[in-house]
Amino acid sequence: IRDCLLSRGLGDVYKRQVGDRYVYFSLPAWKGAGVAVPVFSLRSEKSFGVGDFGDLKRMIDWAVSTKQKAVQILPINDTTMTHTWTDSYPYNSISIYAFHPMYTDLKQLGTLKDKKAMADFNKRQKELNALPAVDYEAVNKTKWEYFHLIFKQEGEKVLSSAAFHDFFESNKEWLQPYAVFSYLRDVYKTPNFREWPKYSSYDAAEIEKLCQPESADYPHIAIYFYIQFNLHLQLLAATEHARANGVVLKGDIPIGISRNSVEAWTEPHYFNLNGQAGAPPDDFSVNGQNWGLPTYNWDVMEKDGYAWWMKRFRKMAEYFDAYRIDHILGFFRIWEIPMHAVHGLLGQFVPALPMTREEIELSLIHI
């Protein structure tokens, strides 16, 4: 515990005791080596041009064989906004819950009964796997072609299963808005929901209607239910495989959300959408950094006991025994930049105790 002198303004100084005694807790001794790797880099002969959750399970086998104890991955949430390579940045997701469809192991979805179509996909798989790097657009385009065909073939059976029913009931709070958002994004050709001619303001009752089986839009929405259910099963299988073999699977939680995301659409009150987060200038970035992400409205979040974060952490804990928060310092203060700014130069830390002009001049720092 130490005494700190703080200032509210010129000549107004008060003392506060600051300590960190309550942030420590005992942990069992643990020592081990591990590897950090993006899932998209885990390409194998069984992949479809990009690493997937099936490859993640095989990565755990490799960790076991090399006596490693941890596998850490980058964010795996859906980042689809334009269906172009600009969506490939893993830290700008459209949902904090939904996984990126490209991480689906297509083999686990089943084989197409159309033998000619299946042969064509097998040929394209070899072509994509032979590339020196991931062709993001080609991979996602091809996988979505497969999704539509396999959903038409197997979707009704899967969506009527007890396992899907349990998944849906446990996840519908985020799953329905995500599925509708993704559908409307493609219908209106933009992820910026503010520009949508209809549903630009989130209405839970209207979204619920769209998700009903009798809705004309249902088939286009239900395919997202199907994909997310399979992603859940595949990642959970990798998780259980890791736990059974004594390997810690570690996830990644980006602190920010996209301005054009499901959360910004459904829960705008939790965010300061009139500012953007970034980083101040330093030796690595002389103009600072502008991430373009809204900051959090912590005062609003505090009122419900940070329920938004609690739900997010609980969901992550289903799949990961540890996760990185990038970056934890942002929970305490963040570099906030005006909306008109391009670089990070004009930002300021929030919250902060700023110095007045008079205080700066009294400190012999002249401006």
Predicted regions and their residues:
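Acidic/aromatic-lined carbohydrate-recognition and catalytic surfaces
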Residues: 27-268, 301-307, 311-315, 334
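Acidic, His- and aromatic-enriched active-site or binding-groove loops in soluble protein domains
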Residues: 88-113, 263-286, 343-363
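Single conserved hydrophobic/aromatic residue that forms the stacking wall/gate
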Residues: 1-14, 365-366
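Short beta-strand elements
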Residues: 12-23
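Active-site capping/gating regions of soluble enzymes
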Residues: 289-364
